[in-house]
A protein has these predicted regions:
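A structural signal for short loop-to-beta-strand junctions that line the ligand-binding cleft
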Residues: 92, 100-102, 130-167, 197, ...
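Extracytoplasmic/periplasmic solute-binding protein
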Residues: 148-154, 159, 183-228, 271
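Conserved C-terminal helix/tail region of periplasmic/extracytoplasmic solute-binding proteins
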Residues: 169, 384-444
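Glycine-centered hinge/linker elements that transmit conformational signals in sensory
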Residues: 186, 226-255
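Long, aromatic- and glycine/proline-rich binding clefts that accommodate carbohydrate-like moieties
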Residues: 298, 348-403, 439-444
Length: 444
């Protein structure tokens, strides 16, 4: 099983942003009554108060439904956000030994650093590891390793090509199945209408990592305290050979991603496609409503026409060791991500689930979306999830890595220059940072 945590779990502690590799987990909480499925049931019946840090759109509705099902439990929901600031705040409360939530939502990229710092409860104690077969391989391996389970997957992000059929038809562009065809389409479209771009990318570390993943790159390898970084491996160079064509020829829309103008251009067709994840459709429908009926979904282009994909985003719910209600917290996590009602509320909010039964269900696969011209777009996402390649690892300081991407590789985007030069700068900065945090970081 692929896992970003597999070999790294020989380390007992790890740096988070700005915190060196040292004992930083802080005092642990009690087990909340011992660990097994029975203790979860007993804890839910007895009740108590939980604090939950989350940002998912479904969180409020899920908490309300959970409290209705278990009236003796009071869940205090806090939208603490995500990203470096939120994770630094969480780590600081863990280190201080007080103030941490009982349950937190973590992006897949952040799970390793909290697992390695011994900050998370191993949910195998409550029998939740028995749920493995109910989740996709990629999402489960993001939270499980070496017989330990650090959370339950919630949403996932298998990647696809989302495109504006009206614009494609207007310019006689066939849906590209290879990256060479995608670059050719970008040139054709922009030459025909200089105000229109095939796609948008300002330089995002997570997005770039996902594209490298799909290309077969494995630039990050973790083995205990040893971290190997090779941002010039074969797969990474495959990606830059394609993306340099778009960057150096100024074929990427310069509009800032997720800005009002960006959504407006997606709605009008000035940005005619996006390589993105299964969570994109809900964003388009709400923020780029003018594109209704024009958009479609297709498999992600590949290098040789053979299906291949990657995950872009995804998150899980974890129980923080500081919690004094660990059994109750584990029960809440199980309800959120493994109960029919909890998962349905997630789906209703526009997120793509991690549970195979829900992904493969006729209700999901047969759902026709008017925004996408009546297409059953979940069929595309489901096939993408099945073609996610294994073997990918995130750095144990991945959150930090993404924060410095704009200052390194991002400069190549900004100046329309060779991405490989930016990747080398990124690698140098990561090696320096990792060694400062107590890892042995080497390059190939």
């Amino acid at each position: 099983m692929r896992s970003s945590l597999r070999t790294a779990l020989a380390v007992t502690v790890v740096a988070t942003v700005g915190i060196a590799l040292s004992g930083c987990a802080g005092p642990g909480g009690s087990t909340g009554g011992g660990g097994d499925a029975t203790s979860i049931e007993d804890a839910l019946e007895e009740g108590g108060t939980l604090t939950y840090w989350a940002w998912a759109p479904s969180s409020e509705a899920q908490v309300a439904a959970f409290e209705k099902a278990y009236p003796n439990v009071d869940v205090k929901l806090v939208n603490a956000g995500s990203g470096v600031d939120a994770y630094t705040k969480l780590q600081n409360t863990i280190k201080a030994g007080k103030g941490a939530p009982d349950v937190a939502q973590l992006e897949d990229t952040a799970v390793p650093q909290f697992a390695l710092s011994d900050s998370l409860v191993d949910l195998t104690a409550y029998g939740l590891d028995e749920l493995e077969d109910q989740y996709t391989v990629g999402t489960w391996s993001a939270v499980a390793s070496d017989g330990k389970l650090f959370g339950l997957p919630q949403d996932s992000g298998p990647m696809s090509l989302y495109y504006n059929k009206r614009v494609f038809d207007q310019h006689g562009i066939a849906v590209p199945t290879t990256w060479d065809e995608y670059v050719a389409a970008a040139k054709t479209l922009h030459e025909a209408d200089p105000s229109t771009y095939l796609t948008s990318d300002n330089g995002d570390g997570l997005f770039a990592s996902s594209l490298i993943w799909q290309a077969g790159g494995r630039p990050f390898q973790v083995d205990g305290t040893k971290v190997t970084i090779d941002l010039q491996d074969e797969g990474t160079l495959k990606w830059t050979s394609v993306w340099n064509e778009l960057v150096e020829n100024e074929l990427l829309a310069p509009t800032a991603a997720y800005s009002d103008d960006w959504y407006k251009q997606l709605g009008s067709g000035q940005i005619a496609s996006l390589i993105s994840a299964a969570w994109l459709p809900s964003l388009l429908q709400t923020a780029a409503a003018d594109g209704a009926g024009d958009w479609r979904a297709a498999p992600m282009p590949t290098y040789d026409g053979t299906p291949a994909s990657a995950n872009y985003g995804g998150s899980a719910q974890v129980v923080i060791k500081q919690s004094e209600q660990q059994a109750l917290a584990a029960g809440f996590v199980e309800w959120l991500n493994n109960s029919p009602e909890g998962i349905q509320l997630l789906i209703d909010s526009g997120s793509f689930p991690s549970t195979t039964a829900d992904i493969d269900s006729p209700a999901s696969l047969d759902l026709a979306t008017e925004y996408f011209g009546g297409q059953k777009i979940n069929e595309v996402a489901q096939a993408s999830g099945e073609s996610v390649s294994e073997g990918w690892q995130y750095l144990p300081f991945q959150v930090y890595a993404q924060t410095i991407f704009p200052d390194t590789v991002g400069q190549s985007y900004a100046n329309n220059t060779d991405l490989n030069e930016g990747l080398k700068d990124w690698q140098d900065a990561l090696v320096k940072y990792g060694n400062e945090q107590g890892f042995e970081v080497v390059t190939k």
